[in-house]
Swiss-Prot record:
UniProt name for this protein: Chaperonin GroEL
Lineage of origin: Bacteria, Bacillati, Actinomycetota, Actinomycetes, Bifidobacteriales
Listed EC numbers: 5.6.1.7
Gene for this chain: groEL
BP-aspect Gene Ontology terms: protein refolding
Subunit structure: Forms a cylinder of 14 subunits composed of two heptameric rings stacked back-to-back. Interacts with the co-chaperonin GroES.
Gene Ontology CC terms, in alphabetical order: cytoplasm
Length: 541
């Protein structure tokens, strides 16, 4: 494909127009009185949302230079969303403000590299001030407050606080459609996976068609269990103990399956066979998770273990196992806490290192099953469009609440940024800057006011008046846009997680630095649209 190249001011101006188009669309959603944006879809109903990253992803501009500028800001929103789960609109507003302030100086002749260094140094000092000002989350009410701010719905805040209180920080809170109007909250006890019994003959409870095994042994194998010889040895070992047996394998078929079923029906030996979840490497990883949770060893050729020669030391144990047609739940596995903690740490490290959203989601599910639990918030609404919008808000609020638990809380409404910047300006790390690095730092201190101004303007109040008033207030006090009052924001429950505020500033500063130091842009040349073919003479009917 042919390329077009532009340089210097022309390059930056085209990118700036794209940045502004995206940022101006996103920033109308900021704050408690922010508006929604309607996103048209090729198929199905449109989506109505106030989620910055969802809006940014939908914007695809025609002009190649504008598209590049918009893509840079999309990266700010996406990176902030990946790290913190919220703060995407704040990050976008900060990036726009930093770029505009910076370009004024570049046009006036400042060295972009020196400006970038100043921006980075000022950002680093402000982040330290934000972290130092953090307040730990100590109560369920604080979690509810921060989730309420994110979702703009007190009922959602309460449900999320209840869910996280039950499943813990590492637990998974999923959001699903509800057939009924309103919000419902369900919890899963223990490790649950989406595979049920291989045959209905294993059912022990006819009323709800489940197989319930009390205090069972658990056999985990990565291969198929097919021959009678495969199963008889293990069955005889377990029968001597008088306990039931759960078999989780790639498959149970051949002579092995009818052998288990017949013994089950006759009451000789109680058991249940289940297919292992997942495929390939993910199946192996999930089997290993189960092994650690239950204190078992996975029987596999790779480890040199054969079913016909194993003893009870390779079998796992649990207080109870409940198996339905579609899923299996292992309650209170007998694995050691040290082994489980080590596995949890390993999965956390994998989450940090993966670039794939899909892999990250699957790893987080595995983490929850090992370390916490699973809560499901079911959302029902009058229309499909309203339900989709509400689900978006709840998903954001869940991640916001988890970020608050992880790194603590700050006063919300953009106030924490302004007050941290005021302290940072007086530190030696900033006052010792000279020349154009000092100019770069000054760019950050001016741009940092953008979120609070935008929140005020979306609430119908002058941003400049709010900024001047907030500067004169004690730490922690600021403008509550929901009530149009100045008050102690932490006490009023107007809070932001440190992780969200910090990530928004760091990602905005990073992209702004790249933007200012851009001197040439190489873009794909737009292909001319082909004219529609003319109708033939015989097409007139």
């Amino acid at each position: 494909m042919a390329k077009i190249i532009s340089y210097d001011e022309e390059a930056r101006q085209g990118m700036l127009e794209g940045l502004d188009k995206l940022a101006n669309t996103v920033k109308v959603t900021l704050g408690p009185k922010g508006r929604n944006v309607v996103l048209d879809k090729t198929y199905g109903a449109p989506t109505i949302t106030n989620d910055g990253v969802s809006i940014a992803k939908e914007i695809d501009l025609e002009d190649p230079y504008e598209r590049i500028g918009a893509e840079l800001v999309k990266e700010v929103a996406k990176k902030t969303d990946d790290v913190a789960g919220d703060g995407t609109t704040t990050a976008t507003v900060l990036a726009q403000s930093l770029v505009h302030e910076g370009l004024k100086n570049v046009v006036a002749g400042s060295n972009p590299i020196a400006l970038r260094r100043g921006i980075e140094k000022a950002t680093e000092v402000i982040v330290k001030e934000l972290v130092a000002a953090a307040k730990d989350v100590e109560t369920k009410d604080q979690i509810a407050a921060t989730a309420t701010i994110s979702a703009a719905d007190p009922e959602v805040g309460e449900k999320i606080a209840e869910a996280l209180d039950k499943v813990g920080q590492d637990g998974v809170v999923t959001v699903e459609d509800n057939n009924r109007f309103g919000l419902d909250l369900d919890f899963t006890e223990g490790m649950r996976f989406d595979k049920g019994y291989i045959a209905p003959y294993f059912v022990t409870n006819a009323d709800d068609q489940t197989a319930v095994l009390e205090d069972p042994y658990i056999l985990l194998t990565s291969g198929k269990v097919s021959s009678q010889q495969d199963i008889v040895h293990v069955a005889e070992l377990v029968m001597k103990t008088g306990k039931p047996l759960l078999i989780i394998a790639e498959d149970v078929d051949g002579e092995a399956l009818p052998t288990l079923i017949l013994n089950n029906i006759r009451g000789t030996f109680k058991s249940c066979a289940v297919k292992a979840p997942g495929f390939g490497d993910r199946r192996k990883a999930m089997l290993q998770d189960m092994a650690i949770l239950t204190g078992a060893q996975v029987v596999s050729d790779e480890l040199g273990l054969k079913l016909e020669s194993v003893d009870t030391s390779v079998l796992g144990h649990a207080k109870k196992v409940i198996v339905s047609k579609d899923e299996t739940t292992i309650v209170q596995g007998a694995g050691s806490k040290e082994d489980i903690d080590a596995r949890v740490a390993q999965i956390r490290a994998e989450i940090e290192n993966t670039d794939s959203d899909y892999d990250r989601e699957k790893l987080q599910e595995r983490l929850a099953k090992l370390a916490g639990g699973v809560a499901v918030i079911k959302v029902g609404a009058a229309t499909e469009v309203e339900a989709k919008e509400r689900k978006h808000r709840i998903e954001d609020a869940v991640r916001n609440a988890k970020a608050a638990i992880e790194e603590g809380l700050l006063p919300g409404g953009g106030v924490a940024l302004v007050q941290a910047a005021a302290k940072a300006e007086k530190t030696e790390a900033v006052t010792s800057l000279t020349g154009e690095e000092a100019t770069g730092a000054a760019i950050v201190f001016r741009a940092i006011e953008a979120p609070i101004k935008q929140i005020a303007e979306n609430a119908g109040v002058s941003g400049d008046v709010v900024i001047n008033t907030v500067r004169s207030l004690p730490d922690g006090e600021g403008f509550n846009a929901a009530t149009d009052t100045y008050e102690d924001l932490l006490a009023a429950g107007v809070t932001d997680p440190v992780k969200v505020t910090r990530s928004a500033l760091q990602n905005a500063a990073s992209i702004a630095g790249l933007f200012l130091t851009t001197e040439a842009v190489v873009a794909n040349k737009p292909e001319p649209k082909s004219a529609a073919p003319a109708a033939g003479a015989d097409m007139g009917y």
